[in-house]
């Protein structure tokens, strides 16, 4: 089968975030709903013909801040679930990450590993990894990241180095 690609992805989301009472300095949470919209895109790989590939994801995460004598270390766990999605019936995504400031520098190092398990066509799943160094300067957020994937489609050249500049307001 083939896909009709629109070339666009629009994401809509809503949720809540907060800190666990009495542990505000150490433990926080986040939860919500994401809607992935692919205007004009349909999946031609289904037995009954084309269907819309837009999907909803429900997510929750916990973050732990561990103070040490040198620097604080942040550890996070994320879980997302979608009852339907791009060429699949169900999928879940789990991610564990760590982040810490490099002592006596303006830099932060972070890394994460995520696992996608799904009932996709051919039952494929994969693990993704990311390592990032970031800083803030001149009113902007700067980051250099390396991303790789193992498992599904791992034989393709999907290692990436990404340089990003952003602003928050």
Predicted regions and their residues:
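Membrane-embedded beta-strand positions in outer-membrane beta-barrel channels/transporters
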Residues: 11-13, 57-61, 95-97, 130-132, ...
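Outer-membrane beta-barrel "beta-signal"
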Residues: 131, 135-137, 156-169
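Short loop/turn motifs that connect adjacent beta-strands in outer-membrane beta-barrel proteins
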Residues: 19-28, 65-73, 101-109, 136-139
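Glycine- and aromatic-enriched membrane insertion/assembly motifs of diderm outer-membrane
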Residues: 1-31, 35, 167-169
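Hydrophobic, well-structured mid-protein blocks that either form specific transmembrane helices
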Residues: 28-92
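Transmembrane beta-barrel outer-membrane domains
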Residues: 3-9, 49-57, 87-93, 122-126, ...
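Sequence/structural signature of outer-membrane beta-barrel proteins
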Residues: 1-5, 21, 34-45, 67, ...
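Membrane-embedded beta-strand positions of outer-membrane beta-barrel proteins
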Residues: 14, 29-33, 60, 73-77, ...
């Amino acid at each position: 089968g083939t896909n009709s690609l629109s070339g666009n992805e629009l994401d809509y989301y809503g949720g809540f975030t907060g800190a666990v009472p009495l542990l505000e300095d150490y433990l926080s949470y986040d939860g919500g709903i994401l809607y992935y919209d692919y205007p004009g895109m349909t999946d031609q790989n289904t037995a009954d013909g084309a269907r819309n590939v837009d999907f909803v994801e429900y997510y929750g995460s916990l973050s732990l801040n561990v103070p040490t004598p040198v620097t604080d270390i942040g550890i996070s766990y994320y879980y997302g679930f979608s009852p339907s999605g791009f060429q699949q019936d169900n999928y879940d995504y789990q991610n564990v990450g760590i982040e810490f400031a490099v002592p006596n520098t303006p830099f932060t190092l972070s890394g994460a590993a995520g696992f996608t398990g799904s009932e996709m066509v051919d039952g494929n799943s994969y693990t993704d990894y990311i390592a990032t160094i970031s800083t803030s300067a001149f009113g902007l957020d700067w980051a250099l990241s390396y991303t790789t994937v193992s498992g599904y489609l791992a034989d393709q050249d999907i290692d990436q180095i990404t340089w990003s500049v952003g602003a928050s307001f």
